[in-house]
């Protein structure tokens, strides 16, 4: 679903609503509840690495790097309402900027609850988000891969899932000179 659907939304907007796209914000809100203390909705190794790496967005022909979760703001999502949203690096921005050269600014926003972020900080602080191998009882293990093995399997979360998600694009540009 994501990435993918945001490319479809952008292509549709470019074809039917804009002559030039100037600003693109991809917004991703998971307002659901899987009733687990901590779980990721897709591969934990990828999810945790995405969130803990530096943010990256495109502005006026340059890629601008930020500290992880440094930039955030409250955005309002359809059928969900306002949620704190964090600027992240997401690979789909790179292809969208390349394929739509009139884009002046492109950003990716994702929501996280405070409880999720607290768990994430603890995971980082105790070294479980590390991707370099460590020695454990004479074996080399990667802490993040070990964590992935003990966390709930994302494919099994749907059964008890409640709530809504919202993924979309907020686009500004011009059509017929306006």
Q: What are these model-predicted stretches?
A:
Residues 1-9, 14:
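Short alpha-helices
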Residues 16-178:
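C-terminal catalytic/substrate-binding lobe primarily of soluble NAD(P)-dependent oxidoreductases
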């Amino acid at each position: 679903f994501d990435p993918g659907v945001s490319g479809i939304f952008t292509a549709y907007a470019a074809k039917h609503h804009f002559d030039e796209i100037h600003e693109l914000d991809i917004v991703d809100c998971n307002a659901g509840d899987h009733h687990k203390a901590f779980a990721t909705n897709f591969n934990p190794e990828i999810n945790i690495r995405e969130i803990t790496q530096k943010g990256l967005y495109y502005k006026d022909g340059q890629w601008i790097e930020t500290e992880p979760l440094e930039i955030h703001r409250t955005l309002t999502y359809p059928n969900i309402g306002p949620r704190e949203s964090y600027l992240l690096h997401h690979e789909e921005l790179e292809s969208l900027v390349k394929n739509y050269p009139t884009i002046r600014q492109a950003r990716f926003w994702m929501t996280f609850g405070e409880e999720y972020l607290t768990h994430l900080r603890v995971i980082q602080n105790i070294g479980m988000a590390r991707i370099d191998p460590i020695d454990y009882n004479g074996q080399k293990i990667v802490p993040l891969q070990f964590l992935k093995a003990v966390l709930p399997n994302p494919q099994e979360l749907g059964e008890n899932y409640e709530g809504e998600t919202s993924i979309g694009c907020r686009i500004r540009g011009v059509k017929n000179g306006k």
